A protein has these predicted regions:
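Viral virion structural and adsorption modules
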Residues: 1-4, 144, 148-157
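Extracellular/virion structural assembly segments
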Residues: 54-120, 150-157
């Protein structure tokens, strides 16, 4: 019987490549992002490419095309000075990595799954979030995904 999962205990991390085009595999290489409150879907539907020929009489035919994550994805965080400092450190580390041809890897750890989700991305500097009366201050920080998200073995301790 399947064990169904919840979002309780999900963590999100980042690490800059030590070796170009090689995902970091040691847990110590990753830094946790604090205050993550929402992670966008990374399960896009592929485009449909129509392959209907003239001899079809009732239905069109298709093959799957490319998937599109939509470019920049918004991750929701509870705003704090710790988050602001951590996000600035992330953006700075990413800029330094890109200057040397390296990438920043993001890792989402869901308790109960044997693999983690990994992708490379470019974070956007944080702006001022929307604010309202008597509410939690949240910010949606953007990361532009730069490769195909993959499920892979979680980093070793």
């Amino acid at each position: 019987m399947a064990t169904y999962l919840s979002t309780i205990g999900v963590h999100m991390y980042y690490a800059v490549e030590e070796t170009k085009e090689t995902r970091p595999t040691a847990k110590s290489a990753y830094t946790e992002l604090v205050g993550v409150k929402g992670i966008p879907s990374m399960n896009p539907t592929p485009d449909n490419l129509e392959t209907t020929t003239l001899n079809e009489t009732e239905y069109k035919t298709y093959i799957p095309g490319l998937k599109d994550l939509g470019g920049s994805l918004g991750f929701t965080f509870n705003m704090s000075q710790d988050l602001k400092d951590a996000w600035e450190a992330l953006v700075t580390a990413d800029e330094a990595a890109r200057a040397t041809g390296k990438a920043t890897w993001f890792y989402i750890d869901v308790p109960g799954l044997t693999d983690g989700l990994f992708f490379t991305g470019q974070p956007t500097p944080m702006g001022l979030p929307e604010m309202g009366v008597n509410s939690v201050l949240e910010v949606e920080n953007s990361i532009t995904v730069t490769n195909e998200p993959v499920w892979a073995t979680k980093p070793a301790a």
